[in-house]
Every structure is written in C-alpha cells, then in structure tokens.
Amino acid sequence: MRLDRTFYSQPTLRLAKSLLGKHFVHESDAGRLSGWIVEVEAYLWRNDPACHAARGITNKNRSMFAQPGTLYIYCIHSCWCMNVVSEIEGRGAAVLIRAIEPIEGINHMLRHRKVLNLVELTNGPGKLCQALGLHRQHDGIDLVLHDSLWIEEPSESPRFRIARSPRIGIRQGTELLYRYFVDGNRYVSGRASCHSGPRNQLLGNSRKAGT
C-alpha cells in the first residue's frame, strides 16, 4: 500500500526510522525498478547546521519546503541525491535516502550504473539515484499522488534491527546521531564497523525465512 500524507507528516527523526524496510518504486521507461530502503539520514529544520534549509529557502532547495511526501533532489559532486520532505509545508525538513536493497529491475539498474558488482549497485545516495534513473527533473514530485514514483508498505514486513550513527560526508552537526540503517545489511554504505556483526544480511532473505 502506498504511503499517505499522514505518514510523511511525522517528525523527521521518526519518519527516518519508519522509512526503513519500506519499498521505493519507480515505474520507469525501462520497467519497474524497486528496492527496500535500508539506510537514511534525517535533516531537521532547526538546530541542524547541516540541513540545506538552515539558511532559508532558495531556488535550489525550494522543494524541501513543499508539502510532506515531496521529493527533494539535489546535485553534489556531479551526483544526484534524493530526499523525502517531512513534517509540514514551509518547514524545510527532510530524510535523505542513502541506500536501498534492490528488488525489481536489477538488470536495468546494472546498465544504468555500468557496474557488475551487485553490492556497489545502490549502496550510496548518488549510486541509488543513478540506478533508479532519478535526476533533476524528478525534483518536486509528490510521492503521494505521482503515477510512477512512490514509496509503499510491503505486503510482508521483514524483521530487522535499526542501528544509528553520525551522518556521513558533512562538516557541521557531526555529533548528531541522525543516520539510521538496517544493521548488518550488505547494501548499507559506510564503514562495516558501524554494524554489530557481519554485513551480510538481506531483507529479502529475512522476509522469506520469517526471521
């Protein structure tokens, strides 16, 4: 079932954790591309110097101030990154989707990424946008209403442990533990030492096993 406006209206930290284990879906020209969300970062509208909204609204971050459930896509180091707007319109808070575990359209994703290693396919915000075929033209899309982009509740929710850490690749707010991820999942980016054990698990396998 597609996530509704109320879901995205949650406080940003709560939304970040709630997005883990959900399905991101793109009905693209190449076919259906989807994956489990396994890593996110929260960016708060106040007391968070790393948030793009900290200095107010601009032409580049305007979508971040839209209604909850809006896609905010920006470019950094020639890579596109996608965020989901949270809370209320005009506030400027969002959750960065950092990694997904691919489910459908993997061959198309591999062609988009020009890689052969599955683990390198979607383990980072720029990588997953490239794999899913997302870029600037998708900025501002409403995930609640759009016909080809949405996030949904899986028919069977897997069980997993949520871990947290400081966010990656920022210079301010480095002490804030606003990064959440599925502990042990092999598609999570960053250092393996952040996990409590081996990084060799898959949500798909967990669901099939019922564990």
Predicted regions located by residue number:
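Conserved, well-structured core segments that form or line functional sites
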Residues: 1-211
